[in-house]
Amino acid sequence: MATSLMKSSLALHAAPRPRSVRLSATSSRVDSPQVSVVLGTQWGDEGKGKLVDNLAQQFDIVARAQGGANAGHTIYDETGRKFALHLVPSGILNPKATCVIGNGVVLHLPGLFEEIRRLKEKGVQVDGRLLVSDRAHLLFDLHKEIDGLREAELAGDGKQIGTTKRGIGPAYSSKATRNGLRVCDLFDRATFKTKLTNLAADGAKRFGEKFAYDVEGDIAAYEKLAEEIRPFVVDTVEYLHEALQSGKRILIEGANATMLDLDFGTYPYVTSSNPSIGGIATGLGLPPSSYDDIVGVAKAYTTRVGAGPYPTEIHGKLAEDLRAVGHEYGTTTGRPRRIGWMDIVALRYACKINGVTHINLTKLDVLDNLEEIQVGVGYKTKEGKMLKSVPADLHTLENVEVVYETLPGWQADISAARQWAQLPAAAQAYVQRIEDLIGIPVKWIGVGPGRDALVVKPEAPKK
């Protein structure tokens, strides 16, 4: 991909003002939102789990709306212990919070119970604190099998997507073609057996002898799993609306990210759900009118796992160094992540789609050793046309020339900073430049992996 180090004019990249946040008649919903949403604004792995873990201390309920075990959230408790979560919401480390897995999630029960087991081994109380939607779709080992077979076919044509092979796409495919099984189906054994047998027959018909799935074994296994999951299962739509009416505070944890969204991402190199704001509404049954605060989480640089266009990608030793410093390996797959500069065009696009009110800028400390830092502020076509947003056409996106601004680095260790004033002037300038370019305030800045490694940026005086 061609790039040019060109300085942009402020006028060219001026961003719209952030939308105002609704205030209730009695209190500021900005300072104390009843419903707050945390979403990824890049290609995933932005550090959403850490912010959710921090904010969860202030909320009664933490809910997941979409995705499955392809989402990997890494968080640390106050003692520095590491927790890698895939299905259980990150709020589980707050003993006062109830965690909800909504109807939009595709749920692999063996994986869920393994995650619960690991949490209990570390002393985390889960029973009575985790609720699962009766409308959530089930993800079976057959979906994982199909995922691997599909990727193998695509690899033969050189068109593999680079999925996590966790069965997410096939599970959502079953949902869309209306032959999927939901959690509520677990409790009618005859119906469950018939539906799963039919689903397995479809897989065998499609892939023939390559499809190695023990349907009878899974039917027997799920008889036991049905009883294990029963205490967790509720009508989460009714539960959440009752909580809303009673004044409880709800934190919604997005999985994956907007640039992987099925509709708005770099299709077909995307996930199979909607990690944007629309997926929150359909994945939980809470209307958009109830959202008081929408936080967009973005790394101070960018990463991506798997194939697909990536305009600001960095190659060579610099990418290797940043990957090593940032520990950029997938929580779910362990694959090395691709590394890139901050992409303002993509970030502004994601903020527009989601109605983002605040930004959490993460992993600023990873850039500590750089003399200069580049920020992608514009896309230019081969014909010299400046693009206002992320183009839908992949050929166009793959061949854009990125317009960069170059900012000075700070070359200092910022991991001990806990206040805005403790950050070097160049680090402050970098954060402020990003804020100015997207027109949305940066509220939190991550300066390390620990729970407390977070700087709150003071609000700018109102004009």
Curated annotation (Swiss-Prot):
Enzyme Commission (EC) number: 6.3.4.4
Recorded superkingdom: Eukaryota
Catalytic site positions: D45, H73
Cofactor(s), names only, from the UniProt record: Mg(2+)
InterPro entries in the record: Adenylosuccin_syn_GTP-bd, Adenylosuccin_syn_Lys_AS, Adenylosuccinate_synth_dom1, Adenylosuccinate_synth_dom2, Adenylosuccinate_synth_dom3, Adenylosuccinate_synthetase, P-loop_NTPase
Listed GO biological process terms: 'de novo' AMP biosynthetic process
Enzyme class: ligase
Binding sites annotated in the UniProt record for Mg(2+): D45, G72
Keywords for the protein's UniProt record, in alphabetical order: Chloroplast, GTP-binding, Ligase, Magnesium, Metal-binding, Nucleotide-binding, Plastid, Purine biosynthesis
Main location: plastid
Cysteines joined through disulfide linkages: none
Note: This protein may be expected to contain an N-terminal transit peptide but none has been predicted.
Name of the protein this chain belongs to: Adenylosuccinate synthetase, chloroplastic
Organism of provenance: Chlamydomonas reinhardtii
Gene this chain is encoded by: PURA
